[in-house]
């Protein structure tokens, strides 16, 4: 089972693409290591860092920074965000 639920798309999330970052809503029980493994397996790009937070609604959001400078744009194009 994948820990990634769906991409989190807001105006702020789209501005983070310029910083090579993407936001995803993830399973609340998943940890950073599981998130990195799932994203690398799904999209084939190396993750540099992960920041997670739990929202006031109880969902867990992950902000992923990628090593390759164009990875975030490539993934966003693949999943239809751009």
UniProtKB/Swiss-Prot annotation:
Gene3D superfamilies, alphabetized? 3.30.70.330
GO cellular component terms? ribonucleoprotein complex; ribosome
This chain belongs to the protein called Large ribosomal subunit protein uL23
Q: Can you tell which superkingdom this protein's organism belongs to?
A: Archaea
- The region annotated as signal peptide is none
Q: Where does this protein come from, organism-wise?
A: Methanosarcina barkeri (strain Fusaro / DSM 804)
Q: Which UniProt keywords apply?
A: Ribonucleoprotein, Ribosomal protein, RNA-binding, rRNA-binding
What the protein does comes down to: Binds to 23S rRNA. One of the proteins that surrounds the polypeptide exit tunnel on the outside of the ribosome.
Example of a GO MF term: structural constituent of ribosome
Instruction: Tell me which Pfam families the record gives.
Output: Ribosomal_L23
